[in-house]
């Protein structure tokens, strides 16, 4: 992760040591989750749970998602069941799936025990899709509208259900069989007359992908069309999820990391290249360097044994 302001990080450490938790909380709520997660990377292990418990519930979950796998696992081991449930309850389903895929079996069991029945069902559905497919990175938390709704009815539905959705700007219109027939935006709905029907507002020429589409292809579509979200459908064009821009960016980072590691002869890493420590890169590259060294030594020995012959040529 990028380093946050060093002075701010040191200030947070001092406030932790001095147990000035109220002041610390006031500072943390002004920071972005990504930057707070970066602070955790510079903390001693015993300080991490203390800082995490100071965070407001929603901010704590958002920060948790931005942490690296090792920090997440360390914190989970220190959580009580009720603390873990608070975090899990605040996670979007796709983030919960990402977390589960990176954790050991004993941690996964704890996470699933604390998830409610509906979330467990959604997690299990997403885990069925092949790795690196659109289905594996999509979320099932989005706004669905019906074509015969008025703009006023649609806005009311968004207000009523939007709080638990990963994105509400783009809304998806489906028929009675859940087949995707159009999309619209909150902006379009707000600018329409109250009694105007969704079917007269929506865009019918919808670009979508199937659940088995390669995630790299999906990420490329975000780049090509400047999407904020992309609908995912099954083989019968039924809407099953959406991929959001933040997940597409994660895919792009993963692919870039793989390309860099291949060029640098480095073993694959779970972390993006720019977030991996120098020691981590050394451990990944060392086996290849050892092989090259042995190969060079072997080649040199062969050449040396033929020096006399070569000298007479």
Q: Can you name each region flagged by the protein language model?
A:
Residues 1-267:
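Hydrophobic packing positions in regular secondary-structure scaffolds
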Residues 148, 258-313:
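Alpha-helical transmembrane segments and their membrane-interface boundaries
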């Amino acid at each position: 992760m990028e380093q946050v302001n060093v002075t701010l990080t040191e200030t947070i450490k001092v406030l932790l040591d001095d147990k000035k938790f109220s002041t610390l909380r006031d500072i943390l709520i002004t920071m972005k989750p990504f930057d707070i997660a970066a602070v955790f990377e510079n903390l001693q292990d015993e300080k991490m749970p203390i800082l995490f418990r100071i965070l407001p519930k929603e901010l704590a979950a958002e920060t948790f998602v931005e942490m690296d796998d090792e920090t997440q696992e360390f914190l989970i081991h220190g959580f009580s069941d009720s603390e873990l449930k608070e975090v899990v309850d605040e996670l979007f389903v796709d983030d919960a799936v990402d977390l589960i895929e990176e954790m050991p079996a004993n941690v996964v069991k704890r996470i699933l025990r604390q998830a409610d029945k509906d979330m467990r069902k959604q997690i299990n559905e997403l885990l069925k899709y092949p790795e690196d497919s659109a289905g594996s990175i999509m979320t099932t938390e989005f706004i669905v509208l019906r074509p015969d709704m008025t703009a006023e009815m649609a806005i009311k539905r968004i207000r009523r259900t939007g709080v638990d959705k990963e994105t509400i700007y783009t809304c998806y219109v489906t028929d009675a069989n859940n087949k995707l027939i159009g999309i619209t935006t909150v902006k379009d709905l707000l600018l329409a007359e109250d009694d105007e029907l969704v079917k007269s507002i929506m865009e019918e020429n919808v670009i979508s992908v199937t659940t088995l589409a390669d995630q790299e292809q999906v990420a490329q579509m975000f780049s090509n069309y400047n999407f904020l979200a992309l609908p995912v459908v099954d083989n019968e064009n039924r809407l099953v999820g959406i991929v959001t821009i933040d997940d597409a960016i994660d895919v792009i980072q993963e692919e870039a990391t793989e390309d860099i590691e291949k060029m640098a002869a480095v073993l694959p890493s779970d972390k993006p290249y720019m977030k991996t420590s120098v020691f981590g890169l050394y451990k990944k590259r060392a086996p290849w360097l050892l092989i090259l060294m042995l190969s060079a030594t072997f080649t040199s020995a062969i050449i040396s044994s033929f020096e006399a012959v070569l000298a007479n040529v």
